[in-house]
Amino acid sequence: MSKTKTNDPGAHHASSGALIRRFLPYLANYKMVLCLDLFCAALTTLCDIVLPKIMSIITNSAMGVGITLTAGIVLKLAALYFVLRIIDGAASYYMSSIGHIMGVHIETDMRRDAFDHLLQLDHTYYNNTKVGTIMGRITNDLFDVTEFAHHCPEEFFIAGIKIVASFVILCRASIPLTLAVFACVPLMGVVSVYLNGRLRARFRQQRVQIGELNSTIEDSLLGQGVVKAFAAEDEEQEKFAKGNRAFEQIKTLGYYAMGAFNTSTRLFDGLMYLVVILAGGLSLVYGKITAGDLVAYMLYVTTLIATIRRIVEFAEQFQRGMTGIERFAEIMDTPVAIKDAPDAVPLQPGPGEIRFEKVCFEYPDDHNKVLHDVSLDIRAGERLALVGASGGGKTTLCNLIPRFYEVTSGRILIDGQDIRRVTLKSLRQDIGIVQQDVYLFSGTVAQNIAYGKPGATRQEIEQAARLAGAEKFILALKDGYDTYVGERGVKLSGGQKQRIAIARVFLKNPPILILDEATSALDNESEILVGQSLEKLAHGRTTLTIAHRLTTIKDYDRILVLGEEGIVEEGTHAQLLAKQGVYYRLWNQLPAEDGK
């Protein structure tokens, strides 16, 4: 039920610098908000830096060093700190609200771009990529970008100010002691970078595995009818349990990596405090530093360690954000194989004549040619049927016309215009497709019909339904045209869904029509009703029909029989029977009750 490959194009791992450069254009769109956020961050940092100095003044004054301590001085210092805390509160509010909202805007922009890019990717990408994986990339993977976008510049900016300010202030108190404390920082940095790399690898594995798990869940839930029909609940539970256990194991390894990272930072915290206790205590004993300065020194070291710890705690969030950006970049770096040529022009209106000139096609991951040197002229308004064994290239040939796939060589022309030289939008607007497996969107009947012509009036929608023979059953529904059809149209029968799909194409009113085995999965009654609707739809249009039931195409203008070597037979129903070739054998294999 699932697709065969995960197609994780992110087998390569971009460097952090490359990912940040990829992210910066999104951040630049909100540079004014960011600058104000960083200004507020500087204000909050000021409060943290000033407090140790206030405590140093009070302690030294109380011990007779420097100015004499009075109630007035205490009140002035308290008033100063009170004002700073008011400023800190206002700045913190801005950072917590507007800063996060900026992150939400960036996440929204990235998700929009990812979705827009996904819509441009061709069928090959979706044939090889699990929907659960794609969903994870444009939803969960970008959730962490909100926190990353807000906190990354803010945390590093605050850390930079505090570390530089602490270093300068600590050096003024005691250069040897400060150098001893900061000697721990490079070693801490090396260990942190190594452990951070392990942490990021674990987060990436988690994202890949949750995509696999989502695909398993999606398969089981969407295919619940098949699961129940085959009493395969146990197999589905085992399949889910296997994926769930794999995710559990990967997440467990991630927490081990996180534990090692946090433990290393605590050890370095303790080492820095130990240096202050030893070196600071000895400096106090030998009169190299005052008690007030040692108190301030300890508070500044505490501020420094708190800053480092905050960066360490942010590392997990940082790596989650980087993983999200990396997987976003992988989507955006997936090349758009089928797109408008630089000089593409809109397809000029015409009657709908189609020409294949020496067309060859092979799938990108399979070098066996599906079509080889196919040359074919289809007259405007002609009804052409394609028959033959499965795998003969019938659907592929039809899929080349709207450029769902690109020809390997040769060319296809519509009304004399090379389809690779016209815009995709104008090309596909001129082609209506009714498939065997109809997809209805979650919404109402009217909304699904209107998909054929965005902005269509209610009158146009109802007229299309009448032409498709769908009006009678629609009006019999509880809410008529406003009836909710369920996910993928689950509340409607196969024949009802087909007629809504036909109504869509009536509303679109294209000159070219492709019917891909549109009635092969229906019961006899539904087939008759849908067949009548298709007859009306095909009238006056160039129509290509892929048919398994040969009785439905007896009256077609021309029938092509496709095989491994290409077009093996061509002619009307009567002509092909007279040849007594492949078509003749296919016709004689039909059961007598099938309408022969």
Question: What do the PLM-derived regions correspond to, one by one?
Answer:
Residues 32, 123-124, 140-149, 153, ...:
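An intracellular "coupling" helix at the cytosolic face of ABC transporter transmembrane type-1 domains
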